[in-house]
Amino acid sequence: MARIAGVDLPREKRVEIGLTYIYGIGRVSADRILEAANVDPSTRVRDLTDDEVKRISAVIDETMTVEGDLRREIALNIKRLQEIGCYRGIRHRKGLPVRGQKTKTNARTRKGPKRTVANKKK
């Protein structure tokens, strides 16, 4: 099993699909990485040579932020927005949608499950 950027890639999948198991790498990024590393995208992960794995790892290390570093960077960006008190930071803090969506009816993913409010007695 090939281990790249601290992630074990599934042996039976093609390399371009296997690379997407790394956080921060999608299909397009995987294709670009393989092109830069001069590796055939249709090769299975189990058929990769040690040299090819090293070339792929080198390209990822040089050009991309992946896995823990990327997660940390995103968390720090959100924390910075909250500290400066901008609109996006406030929305993050309140757990509401950040990108301008309406919240009257939907937005349940960000808000969480409904909390029922008791009716006032007359």
From Swiss-Prot:
Question: Region Disordered: what ranges?
Answer: 95-122
**Record's function text:** Located at the top of the head of the 30S subunit, it contacts several helices of the 16S rRNA. In the 70S ribosome it contacts the 23S rRNA (bridge B1a) and protein L5 of the 50S subunit (bridge B1b), connecting the 2 subunits; these bridges are implicated in subunit movement. Contacts the tRNAs in the A and P-sites.
Per the record, the similarity remark reads: Belongs to the universal ribosomal protein uS13 family.
SUPFAM superfamilies cross-referenced by the UniProt entry: S13-like H2TH domain
Q: How does it assemble?
A: Part of the 30S ribosomal subunit. Forms a loose heterodimer with protein S19. Forms two bridges to the 50S subunit in the 70S ribosome.
InterPro entries xref list: Rbsml_uS13_C (IPR027437), Ribosomal_uS13 (IPR001892), Ribosomal_uS13-like_H2TH (IPR010979), Ribosomal_uS13_bac-type (IPR019980), Ribosomal_uS13_CS (IPR018269)
Q: Which domain of life is it from?
A: Bacteria
Sorted keywords for this record are:
Ribonucleoprotein, Ribosomal protein, RNA-binding, rRNA-binding, tRNA-binding
Q: Which Pfam families match?
A: Ribosomal_S13
From its record, what is one biological process in GO terms?
A: translation
Q: What is this protein called?
A: Small ribosomal subunit protein uS13
The molecular function terms of the Gene Ontology recorded here are: rRNA binding; structural constituent of ribosome; tRNA binding
UniProt organism field: Agathobacter rectalis (strain ATCC 33656 / DSM 3377 / JCM 17463 / KCTC 5835 / VPI 0990) (Eubacterium rectale)
Where would one find coiled-coil regions in this protein?
none
Q: Name one GO cellular component term.
A: cytosol
NCBIfam families in the record, alphabetically?
uS13_bact
